[in-house]
């Protein structure tokens, strides 16, 4: 289970596993294992063991020695490959001693200096003296520290009960980890990343090896399970970081060397070979240091090829008439690359090499040279033979038979056979060990200039064993010729040897005691629709790609274990869409798994693009399988692919199943999961534990066997239920199960349309929340306020949750500041769960296993973009002084504002982390003081606005109870007061308009009074809809009359002289009324508003566009003016009419108000 804690400063992650040895498993049990558990409560049960499952930090390392950088790297890689074949813990001390002796052979930094010089020469760039000395000094310190740690580890392993040994090794481990953290940046100096790359790769390799030790020994050192998980997460995080760094700068260095001529190609070619051996081969092993994923060891397969230099006369300088090939002007970079480097292909083995010889005369002399060759090769475990021919094939031939183990060394002689007029480059001798000899004749015997090649110079043997590290797999060839005056001037026939590592298993052997790696590039034959790609450097070889349904490839395997042995399957893949993989054994399906996308279309393949997924084995569709014969055929198919997607497979893994051991591992895992929830006293939950972790621990316990571990299961269930109760008690959110939405209670969840609650499902043990996409300008949201009364001043709080999938989900925590988090979580938690026969229809054991694997594959997020994609999240917010004058609760807001956004999430909780202290407290106090000062400034400003608005509203009424409107005021005065009220800021939260801001209460107070004034104004006005807010309702109109809007203001517009608008009124006869009109005339002519009664009495207010003074104030034709007239109606029916003579007439409001005498 991973957990990603995200705030402004940090993002944290964590997974887990456990693995007892076979020696510890005993079935059947000699005595009842449950007897001691009777009458015991869960706290006693959890205290029963000496192990402590609460929290940890860790680090391991590696060393190398040899006469030069390449040999040292080959020696290190070879030893690591051997160590990875068995569990690490049994050989760790000798393994570290070997690495120390290899990398610091005489306790100095000569090897590291060799690494630096190697790349400096390849790229022709010197490391600055300061950077070199600084790096070497730090490397010397790392070597010394690692040596101390190795000895401390050796002493502790010799006597694990010695408390001094324990405290020393634990302290040395922590110190060495920090040494690496501080040292690694010195090997990545800006501008010198490429020449320092070999040093960087070897150093980070040691760091990752060190970090692995936390998982191996952390419990014995007294680390809590949480601490161990933290170290494990750092190992995963740094594996991705270090891998991507090495891959990026390898490619950068290679691209910088790309040129146009022979010399540039040679430098490019050498850099590619040596950096593959020194950097990429090491990087490809990083994932196998994960002892949770590979507890019993594995056999990594480095299937990549390397090429030694072309066999051609190319000494450092010309010799007499002879010319070194590197300076020739007639071969281009691209033709050499195309001729010498094979296109991506399936892994194959060389069966035989038949070399043709041809005689080239120069005057009376001649040379028999290697003119071409025919290769016979086979794909692994395939009887079909592939044949390739290069160059000129003649009848004079020599056949090389590499034998079962293959050729591992070749000594060759390249000749420049030249006169003053003509020259030819050729190879006249090559000795293959083992394999045979090609030997051509020259006349005279010592004719021509010679250059001797020994492949051991470029691929030296492992220094510790003297054994060769590579075998010959292919030979490419390049022929060229230039003419002058119709005759040959220069010609050449140049072979290049291609090599693969000798430890690649040519039989695809399946063993019962370790996880077998089957790279799909080791398939037995090409398949239509499947493309072989040169994999990224970190895959260690080629990968296969498909874009349609069909067969990826067929692997022929050799089973070296009893046919009763059970296995399960894993796959390492990358994809831009969802698809399924099905594996068949001899045509019978033995496993299928649905996989989600791991990358976006068009993205480059990075380390994070690849995920390892297990084919679940607990369900009826993917039971553990067995092999039926010693030679089997495994077919890997792609199914259910999406159109336009790209689907990549790196490898299939065959994992031995030990039911007895795995059952005990399940119990141990459940114990760890449950125990790690609690504090050491078992009375409370650990601060970093989330509600989601509690639910997943409950699932682990539920999956334990009732028959084997009935009482253990009972105790663990009691404990995990207690943990769930503690989780609910500490959760400050009301109704975390979403039982009631939009209740009438003050607090609790408030939500918009588009929010639904789902019950359970394969990814949540409880209820889940679903937010649909927004509707144009209407977001989908749900929020809740945590009241200040339950908060503490200067305290950190954390919001946790689990997102199944989301797009544009915004998560906000609001106090006196806002913490904003956006989650774009891919829908990659593919559920292959099946019904277990229960009412829920969900097999929690199967679901738990799948989801945990996918979450473990998320790694630690490297940046905010990756953090946005993790399923688990945590967001932090700190409280200040909880100023009593402001309602300072914490608002929790979830919303989707985009029309294609969505979210499904659950396990929400807001918990107290603890009081702030030190720098965090000081920073919060400073921020809080600034906030209070700013609040005071804003309040002073708002107080001025509030006082002005309140005075304006007071003027609207004649009484203190706001029951009677001032007869002298009209709509203009109400609008003026409204504008003042609307100028109040901080009424609503910037995050969501439904959340009140700090000035919400005063705004509401004034708004309520304004509404009362508007109501009284509307009630007293005999003219219906006199402010035209309801358009032309209640008005009789002709054409060319309309209502327009400008902001909150509505006004009647007459745009033609024949337009008329009128309304009939009912009034009290013989009472005093005032007709008040606010209007504006534009253009020529006049505008008229006339009032008349049934007795033919009338009054008219006239408006025109001429300039004039109103009470001594100049008014232009863009201003609205108000005119009024007193009228005494003699009938109860009245008419108001609006017209104009020409131009346009704009009327803001018409009032006919009864007044007192």
Swiss-Prot record:
A Pfam family reported for this protein in Swiss-Prot or TrEMBL: Cry1Ac_D5
Instruction: Please give the function described in this protein's UniProt entry.
Output: Promotes colloidosmotic lysis by binding to the midgut epithelial cells of Lepidoptera larvae. Has a fairly broad spectrum of activity against members of the Pyralidae, Plutellidae, Sphingidae and Noctuidae families. It was the first insecticidal crystal protein characterized with activity against cutworms. No activity is observed against some beetles, such as the Colorado potato beetle.
**Additional observations:** Toxic segment of the protein is located in the N-terminus.
Listed as disulfide-bonded, the cysteine pairs are none
Q: What is this protein called?
A: Pesticidal crystal protein Cry9Ca
- Which GO biological process annotations does it have? sporulation resulting in formation of a cellular spore; symbiont-mediated killing of host cell
GO molecular function ontology, one term from the record: signaling receptor binding
Q: Hey, which family's this protein in?
A: Belongs to the delta endotoxin family.
Q: Its gene?
A: cry9Ca
Q: What are the entry keywords? A: Sporulation, Toxin, Virulence
Task: Provide the species name.
Answer: Bacillus thuringiensis subsp. tolworthi
The coiled-coil segments of this chain are none
- Highest taxon above the source species: Bacteria
């Amino acid at each position: 289970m991973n957990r990603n804690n995200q705030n402004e400063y940090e993002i944290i992650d964590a997974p887990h596993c456990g693995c007892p040895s076979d020696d510890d498993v005993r079935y059947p049990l000699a005595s009842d294992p449950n007897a001691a558990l009777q009458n015991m409560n869960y706290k006693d049960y959890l205290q029963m063991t000496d192990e402590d499952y609460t929290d940890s930090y860790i680090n391991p390392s590696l060393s190398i020695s040899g006469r030069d950088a390449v040999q040292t790297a080959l020696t290190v890689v070879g030893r690591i490959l051997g160590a990875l074949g068995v569990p690490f813990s049994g050989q760790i001390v000798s393994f570290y001693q070997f690495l120390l002796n290899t990398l610091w052979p005489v306790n100095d930094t000569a090897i590291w200096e060799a690494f630096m010089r190697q790349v400096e020469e390849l790229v022709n760039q010197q490391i600055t003296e300061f950077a070199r000395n600084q790096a070497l000094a730090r490397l010397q310190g790392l070597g010394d520290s690692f040596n101390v740690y190795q000895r401390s580890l050796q002493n502790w392993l010799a006597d694990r009960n010695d408390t001094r040994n324990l405290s020393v090794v634990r302290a040395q481990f922590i110190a060495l980890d920090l040494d690496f953290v501080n040292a690694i940046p010195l090997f990545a100096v800006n501008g010198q990343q490429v020449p320092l790359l070999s040093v960087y790769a070897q150093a980070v390799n040691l760091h990752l090896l060190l970090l692995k030790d936390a998982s191996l020994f952390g419990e014995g050192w007294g680390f809590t399970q949480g601490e161990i998980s933290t170290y494990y997460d750092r190992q995963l995080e740094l594996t991705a970081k270090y891998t991507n760094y090495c891959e990026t700068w390898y490619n950068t260095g290679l691209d910088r060397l790309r040129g146009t001529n022979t010399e540039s190609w040679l430098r490019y070619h050498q850099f590619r070979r040596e950096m593959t051996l020194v950097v990429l081969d090491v990087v490809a092993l990083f994932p196998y240091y994960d002892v949770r994923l590979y507890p019993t060891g594995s056999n990594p397969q480095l299937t990549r090829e390397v090429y030694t230099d072309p066999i051609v006369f190319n000494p450092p300088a010309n010799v007499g008439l002879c010319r070194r090939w590197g300076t020739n002007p007639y071969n281009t970079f691209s033709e050499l690359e195309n001729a010498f480097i094979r296109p991506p292909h399936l892994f194959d083995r060389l069966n035989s090499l038949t070399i043709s010889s041809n005689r080239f005369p120069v005057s009376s002399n001649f040379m028999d040279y290697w003119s071409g060759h025919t290769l016979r090769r086979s794909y692994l475990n395939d009887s079909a033979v592939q044949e390739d021919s290069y160059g000129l094939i003649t009848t004079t031939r020599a056949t090389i038979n590499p034998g079962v183990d293959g050729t591992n060394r070749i000594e060759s002689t390249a000749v420049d056979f030249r006169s003053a007029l003509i020259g030819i480059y050729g190879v006249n001798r090559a000795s293959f060990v083992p394999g045979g000899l090609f030997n051509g004749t020259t006349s005279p015997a010592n004719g021509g200039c010679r250059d001797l090649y020994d492949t051991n110079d470029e691929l030296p043997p492992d220094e510790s064993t003297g054994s060769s590290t590579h075998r010959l797999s292919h030979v490419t060839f390049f022929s060229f010729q230039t003419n002058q005056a119709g005759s040959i001037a220069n010609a050449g026939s140049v072979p290049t040897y291609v090599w693969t590592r000798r430890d690649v298993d040519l039989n695809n052997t399946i063993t019962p005691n370790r996880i077998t790696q089957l790279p799909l590039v080791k398939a037995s034959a090409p398949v239509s629709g499947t493309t072989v790609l040169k994999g990224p450097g970190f895959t260690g070889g080629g990968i296969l790609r498909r874009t349609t349904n069909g067969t990826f490839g067929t692997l022929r395997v050799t089973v070296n274990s009893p046919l009763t042995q059970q296995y399960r399957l894993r796959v390492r893949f990358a994809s831009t869409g969802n698809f399924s993989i099905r594996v068949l054994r001899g045509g019978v399906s033995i496993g299928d798994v649905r996989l989600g996308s791991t990358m976006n279309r068009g993205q480059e393949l990075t380390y994070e693009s690849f995920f390892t997924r297990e084919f679940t084995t607990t369900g009826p569709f993917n039971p553990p399988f067995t092999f039926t014969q010693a030679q089997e055929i495994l077919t890997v198919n792609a199914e259910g692919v999406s159109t336009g997607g790209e689907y990549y497979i790196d490898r299939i893994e065959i994992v031995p199943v030990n039911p007895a051991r795995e059952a005990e591992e399940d119990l141990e895992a459940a114990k760890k999961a449950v125990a790690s929830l609690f504090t050491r006293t078992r009375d409370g939950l650990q601060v970093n534990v989330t509600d989601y972790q509690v639910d997943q621990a409950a699932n682990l316990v539920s999956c334990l066997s009732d028959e084997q571990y009935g009482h253990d299961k009972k105790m663990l269930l009691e404990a995990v239920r207690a943990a769930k109760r503690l989780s609910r008690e500490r959760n400050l959110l009301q109704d975390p199960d979403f039982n009631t939405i939009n209740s009438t209670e003050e607090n609790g969840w408030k939500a918009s349309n588009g929010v639904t609650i789902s019950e359970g499902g394969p990814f949540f043990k409880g209820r889940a929340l679903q937010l649909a996409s927004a509707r144009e300008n209407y977001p989908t949201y749900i929020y809740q306020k945590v009241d200040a009364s339950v908060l503490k001043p200067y305290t950190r709080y954390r919001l946790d949750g689990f997102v199944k999938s989301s797009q544009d989900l915004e998560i906000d925590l609001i106090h006196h500041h806002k913490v904003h988090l956006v989650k774009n979580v891919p829908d990659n938690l593919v559920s292959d769960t099946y019904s277990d026969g229960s009412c829920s229809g969900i097999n929690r054991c199967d679901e738990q296993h799948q989801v945990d694997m996918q979450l473990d594959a998320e790694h630690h997020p490297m940046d905010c973009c990756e953090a946005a994609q993790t399923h688990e999240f945590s967001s932090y917010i700190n409280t200040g002084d909880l100023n009593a004058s402001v309602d300072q609760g914490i608002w929790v807001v979830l919303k989707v504002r985009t029309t294609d956004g969505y979210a499904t999430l659950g396990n929400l909780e807001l918990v107290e982390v603890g009081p702030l202290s030190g720098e965090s407290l000081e920073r919060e106090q400073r921020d809080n003081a600034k906030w209070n000062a700013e609040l005071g400034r804003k309040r002073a400003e708002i107080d001025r606005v509030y006082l002005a608005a309140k005075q304006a509203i007071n003027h609207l009424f004649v009484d203190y109870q706001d029951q009677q409107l001032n007869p002298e005021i009209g709509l203009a005065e109400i609008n003026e007061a409204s504008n003042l009220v609307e100028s109040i800021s901080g009424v609503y939260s910037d995050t969501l308009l439904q959340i009140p801001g700090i000035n919400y209460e005063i705004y509401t107070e004034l708004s309520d009074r304004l509404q009362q004034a508007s109501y009284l104004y509307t009630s007293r006005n005999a003219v219906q809809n006199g402010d035209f807010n309801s358009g032309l309702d209640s008005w009789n109109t002709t054409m060319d009359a309309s209502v327009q809007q400008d902001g909150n203001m509505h006004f009647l517009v007459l745009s033609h002289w024949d337009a008329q608008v009128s309304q009939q009124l009912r009034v009290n006869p013989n009472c005093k009324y005032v007709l008040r009109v606010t209007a504006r005339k534009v253009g020529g002519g006049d505008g008229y508003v006339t009032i008349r009664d049934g007795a033919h009495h009338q009054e008219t207010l006239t408006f025109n566009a001429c300039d004039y003074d109103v009470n001594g104030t100049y008014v232009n034709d863009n201003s609205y003016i108000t005119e009024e007239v007193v009228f005494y109606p003699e009938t109860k029916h009245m008419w108001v009419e609006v017209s104009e003579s020409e131009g346009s007439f704009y009327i803001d409001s018409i009032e006919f108000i009864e007044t007192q005498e």
